[in-house]
């Protein structure tokens, strides 16, 4: 069951406030339009989520908005590491900043959701839309953004369970563990803070605490 909208907005606001405090002042020293930005958008009606939009600047700052189409837009700030940021822009360069690009296979296949890549810099804008592509660079870029979608969803679900559904924390940690095992999370170290809090909090069930500690240990050992 999806959480009440006010609870989800509370989680997003809390994460946004904490992130704004933590971000270096230099990140806001220049106008956002000064930094090249890559945007990924996916619209897939009757799925969950139906709408995803992730924006990443060349500084590694950005926003994510993951929701159903009927929900109010609620983009929240987030950051990614320098290596992942560099990889996103390397792939974008290989794809000519999406200028004059045709990625779709143009075959009769199932609707997998409309995806959009967009590049913006100082008034320059290029974008490409597709349902399915065989282009290797585009597939790699898509996998990164799909992974970020999964990662931010896992993080929000875990933090929501910690606040409002303590008995559901074990299920949330187990989902993070499953996604980590399948190598779906581009930066699993971003989940260490909530995992550590679960592991140290005696108000959560023992199995959740044990699982969180074990997963955090694995992530630290690998990253």
Q: Over which residues does each language-model region extend?
A:
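Charged, amphipathic alpha-helical segments
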Residues: 84-106
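Extracytoplasmic
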Residues: 35, 49-51, 59, 83, ...
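Hydrophobic h-region of N-terminal signal peptides that target proteins for export
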Residues: 20-29
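Bacterial N-terminal signal peptides that target proteins for export
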Residues: 2-17
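Short, well-ordered, aromatic-rich surface patches in folded extracellular/luminal domains
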Residues: 28-44, 101-223
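N-terminal, post-signal-peptide region of Sec/Tat-exported proteins
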Residues: 55-87
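Short secondary-structure boundary/capping segments within folded domains
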Residues: 43-46, 53-55
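Short amphipathic beta-strand/extended segments with alternating polar/hydrophobic composition
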Residues: 53-57, 75-80, 123-134
């Amino acid at each position: 069951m999806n959480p009440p909208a006010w609870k989800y907005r509370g989680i997003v606001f809390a994460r946004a406030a904490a992130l704004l405090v933590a971000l270096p002042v230099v990140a806001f020293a220049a106008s956002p339009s000064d930094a090249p930005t890559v945007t990924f958008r996916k619209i897939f009606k009757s799925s969950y989520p139906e709408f995803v939009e992730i924006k990443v600047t060349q500084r590694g700052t950005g926003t994510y908005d993951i929701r159903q189409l009927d929900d109010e837009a609620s983009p929240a700030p987030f950051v990614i590491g320098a290596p992942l940021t560099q990889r996103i822009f390397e792939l974008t360069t290989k794809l000519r900043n999406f200028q004059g690009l045709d990625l779709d296979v143009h075959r009769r296949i199932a609707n997998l959701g409309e995806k959009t890549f967009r590049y913006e810099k100082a008034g320059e804008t290029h974008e490409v839309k597709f349902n399915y592509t065989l282009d290797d660079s585009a597939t790699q870029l898509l996998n990164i953004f799909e992974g970020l979608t999964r990662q931010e969803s896992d993080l929000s679900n875990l933090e929501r369970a910690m606040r409002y559904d303590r008995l559901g924390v074990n299920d949330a940690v187990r989902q993070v563990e499953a996604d980590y095992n399948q190598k779906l999370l581009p930066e699993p170290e971003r989940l260490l803070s909530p995992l550590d809090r679960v592991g140290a909090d005696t108000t959560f069930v023992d199995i959740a605490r044990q699982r969180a500690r074990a997963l955090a240990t694995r992530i630290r050992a690998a990253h």
